[in-house]
Amino acid sequence: MLKQLRPALVLLTALTAITGLAYPLAMTGLAGAIFPAKAAGSLIERDGTVIGSSLIGQNFTGAGYFHGRPSATTAPDPADASKTVPAPYNAANSSGSNLGPTSAALAERVKADVEALKSENPGAPVPVDLVTTSGSGLDPDISPEAAYFQVPRVAKARNIPQDKLRDLVTARIEGRTLGVLGEPRVNVLALNLAVDDLARR
């Protein structure tokens, strides 16, 4: 019996060592050598302090900042662990919304968001990504249209001319990946850091 089990045990041990140890360590080392910043999480530092990642959105709410997409992520309810409460951009619980197109709660939330955005910029069409959540709830980017839409509010709050903010948005538009994948986008954290820098001048 041991003679019959030995090949299976040897194969199990070998494959575990190769695929569970050697391969992951090799890929981690290779990624760290070729793409050190990306392998470390694409972290963004300011004055020696990590303030975020270019890959994970943050919940900007102040009038003087550009806002990202709505986030449907949640966290455990402190009062009842069997329930959850909204926790926008909670990276520990990445998820989209389970609300379908016939959901009254979703329709009410979108309607309220559209009305709030229209009050900020009357007469301009509301970009769809400012009222819809992403699949992960952690999307770090918005469309250029969503960024331009927010320029009047940010300009008023920061007392910065709108044309300067529009130029800032234009300078931070990232094109399609490999020229064909995805859509043009603006990283919200990078844009807000640039706004902070502009406001200091």
From Swiss-Prot:
What UniProt keywords apply to this chain's record, in alphabetical order? ATP-binding, Cell inner membrane, Cell membrane, Ion transport, Membrane, Nucleotide-binding, Potassium, Potassium transport, Transmembrane, Transmembrane helix, Transport
Q: Which domain of life does this protein belong to? A: Bacteria
Gene behind the chain: kdpC
Look up the signal peptide feature and give its range: none
Location (main, coarse): membrane
Stated family: Belongs to the KdpC family.
Q: What is said about its interaction partners and assembly?
A: The system is composed of three essential subunits: KdpA, KdpB and KdpC.
The molecular function GO annotations come to: ATP binding; P-type potassium transmembrane transporter activity
Give a yes or no for keyword Lipid biosynthesis in this entry. Answer: no
Q: What is this protein called?
A: Potassium-transporting ATPase KdpC subunit
